[in-house]
Amino acid sequence: FISAIASMLGKFL
């Protein structure tokens, strides 16, 4: 779960 969120944040950043 956290990994998915981190990936999404990384995409935005």
Curated annotation (Swiss-Prot):
Gene Ontology biological process terms, A to Z: defense response to bacterium
Primary location recorded for the protein, binned into one broad class: secreted
Tissues expressing the protein: Expressed by the skin glands.
Subcellular location: Secreted
Sorted UniProt keywords: Amphibian defense peptide, Antibiotic, Antimicrobial, Secreted
Any GO CC annotation of this UniProt entry: extracellular region
Domain of life per record: Eukaryota
Stated family: Belongs to the frog skin active peptide (FSAP) family. Temporin subfamily.
Function: Antibacterial activity against Gram-positive bacterium S.aureus (MIC=100 uM). Shows no detectable hemolytic activity towards human erythrocytes.
Protein's recorded name: Ranatuerin-6
